[in-house]
């Protein structure tokens, strides 16, 4: 059965395996999450569960959200996300989803909002080549040619240009779960994941796992 959970990034560290080799891991506080709503094909056109994560005070929520949580009879949560699943019979409104749904060796996809870098040029943003750095050249880190003149008389879509870099939804696929700590609600995955410390992460079964 497919599964997913919400979590919060704590940062990176390293652990040692049985052979004494160093494994870089990201520490994620995953769950506990609570099922706030079940969506079915009959009522909504698709099967999904809506889960909440992170406690929050009532005064920080809008009236529609307060009513949504009270109708479900669950505590107020800061984050609400949906997981589309083929089979939702194993979930009930109010039930908890904990980190022990995963085990070491599982493969997961982790989605988050990448770190924002602010306004950046094409060299930093896309890795564009520089211009000549000497011999009187006045072109070093600029965009370069943006197209012809009369024909076509415009800049084509997709042309790399300076702009806001980062702060985008990014998914890192097929990360290995190295360790699970149910007591501390910690999930250790091999490698890095998007976002700064404390940011929200969505952890799902990997779509590429065999």
Curated annotation (Swiss-Prot):
Q: Any idea which UniProt keywords this protein has? A: Ribonucleoprotein, Ribosomal protein, RNA-binding, rRNA-binding
Q: Which Gene3D superfamilies match?
A: 3.30.160.810, Translation factors
Cite a single Pfam family from the UniProt record.
Answer: Ribosomal_L3
Question: Which Gene Ontology cellular-component terms appear in the entry?
Answer: cytosolic large ribosomal subunit
For biological process, the GO terms are: translation
One Gene Ontology term of the molecular function aspect? structural constituent of ribosome
Tell me the segments the record calls region Disordered: 131-154
* General function of this protein: One of the primary rRNA binding proteins, it binds directly near the 3'-end of the 23S rRNA, where it nucleates assembly of the 50S subunit.
Record-stated family: Belongs to the universal ribosomal protein uL3 family.
Summarize subunit and interaction data from the UniProt record for this chain. Answer: Part of the 50S ribosomal subunit. Forms a cluster with proteins L14 and L19.
Query: Which NCBIfam families does this entry report, sorted A to Z?
Result: L3_bact
Protein name listed in UniProt: Large ribosomal subunit protein uL3
């Amino acid at each position: 059965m497919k599964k997913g959970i919400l979590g919060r990034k704590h940062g990176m560290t390293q652990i040692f395996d049985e052979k004494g080799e160093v494994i870089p891991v990201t520490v994620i506080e995953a769950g506990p999450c609570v099922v706030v709503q079940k969506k079915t094909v009959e009522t909504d056109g698709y099967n999904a569960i809506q889960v909440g994560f992170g406690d929050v005070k009532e005064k920080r929520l809008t009236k529609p959200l307060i009513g949504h949580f009270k109708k479900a009879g669950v505590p107020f949560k800061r984050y609400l996300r949906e997981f589309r699943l083929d089979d939702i019979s194993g979930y009930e409104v109010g039930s908890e989803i904990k980190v022990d749904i995963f085990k070491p060796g599982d493969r997961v996809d982790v989605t988050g909002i990448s770190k924002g870098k602010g306004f950046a040029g094409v060299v930093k943003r896309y890795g564009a080549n520089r211009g000549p750095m000497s011999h009187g050249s006045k072109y070093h880190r600029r965009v370069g040619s943006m197209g012809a003149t009369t024909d076509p008389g415009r800049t084509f879509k997709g042309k790399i240009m300076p702009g806001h870099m980062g702060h985008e939804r990014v998914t890192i696929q097929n990360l290995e779960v190295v360790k699970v700590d149910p007591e501390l609600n910690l999930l250790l995955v091999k490698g890095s994941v998007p976002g700064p410390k404390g940011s929200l992460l969505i952890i799902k079964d990997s779509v590429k796992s065999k």
